[in-house]
């Protein structure tokens, strides 16, 4: 099963984290600069680690060179609700810091 999510990338952040912005968008904060694909690789690594999936199961399908990205997550055991439940602890921790 594949799920596509839209995220806003925020490169050169102090910490790597998954958060929600004031508009309710899912944001991926990464410490890498947006050069030579470093930020995109860090986004994939962070999402995969958070969801406990192999990095090969996370793919940026649109927005390789811009901040707004579409990401495909492939997993045989995660549906959309389970995906959000897996991301929530990470987001809640960063929302209240």
Swiss-Prot record:
It comes from the Bacteria. InterPro entries: DUF167, YggU-like_sf. It holds the Pfam family DUF167. Signal peptide: none annotated. One of its GO terms (cellular component) is cytoplasm. Coiled coil: none annotated. NCBIfam families: DUF167 family protein (TIGR00251). PANTHER family: UPF0235 PROTEIN C15ORF40. Belongs to the UPF0235 family. This is UPF0235 protein Aasi_0294. It comes from Amoebophilus asiaticus (strain 5a2).
